[in-house]
Amino acid sequence: MTATETVAARAVPDWRGGFGRLWTAAVVSRFGDSLRTAALPLLAASLTDDPLLIASVTACGFLPWLLFGLLGGAVADRVDQRRAMWAVDLVRGALMAAFAVAVALGHATIALLLVLAFALTTLQTLFDNAATALLPALVPTEALAAANARLMTGQQFAGGLLAAPLVPALLLAGDAVPYVADAATYVLAALLIASLRTGAPERPPRPAGSTLRKEMTEGLATLRRDRPLRWLCTATTLCNIGMGALIATLVVHVTDGHQAGSAGNAAYAATLTAYAVGGVIGGFLARRVAERTGRIRAVALAGTVQTGCLVLMGAVPALAVSIAAMAVFGFMGTVWNVNQTTLMQERAPEGMLGRIAAAFRTLAVAGAPLGALLGGAAAAGWGPHTPALLAAALFALAVASLAPLIN
């Protein structure tokens, strides 16, 4: 094998090793999560007609990231990530099984939904940060981009294209069935992760007197000092504010001009499907885009094209335009996410990836609800197509913030 062939081989993750099991666990788990997240709002709406209470279920899914996101990253850097992940999935599986029993027996309440959403996301803060930190131990550095692309493509396909359409059929079989399926996927994912054969993580000894609080502060300080990571985190946060504005009002944008009912629902479903399909295709091509342009330029290119898509959606209020724009937007969204995550994994100092990932995720989650509020206010004040233009402005700022890295 020539040197060129060796490098090319190392740039592709080996399915036969631990990566294949991690990929399967991630895809299976996303499938179950998507069943639950599609079914929970329907259950909440059947329990109360108070929109504030229904929205509170979603809010409880965000809150733990703001409260415990950085803590989850610090813990992920301290522990054996593999063990933490399968233990968390077993606990989440047990919680979902208990919740499924409560639904089957007719004991579900809004209070129970709030507690469940908060508990699951609290556990997710540790799981997601540990998963990001574990991946570089399973694949060579040269294969990180391809591995991230395959993970995101599989998750997008399972969650966006497979799970959501199944929910109505599963609910016909019983109100508890989606939650039983979610519990089963957690257990299966835990078994797959537990079967990984990775050595104990090698970390430098912690200084005397080191605490989780000090380690969280150290992670933020490292992010602030690293110029590429700092600007990349800034750009990602701005984009997530824009995404919050777009997604929160997308149904109003798409159904504007349709009568309430099947026509509007079909238009909205077609738009979401186009976005998911674009995201899946983007996963297949994200690494190739980076190979041609460089990783940071791939991120900037993705943001630039997404800005154009948002301007088009806001300026041309036609359903066909929205569907096409969302397909391209989803494509470039995966290109951004794959290369942003890979850059973060490549640049984070050894033993600090969990904390760096936690800072990215915490700021991203904080941006989404802020964007949703801004998007709602824009739609109420200036019409249903204004949030897309607001999102375009935020994406343009994000791309501009990357200019120092490109130059």
Model segments located where?
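Alpha-helical transmembrane-bundle signature of multi-pass membrane transport and export proteins
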Residues: 1-407
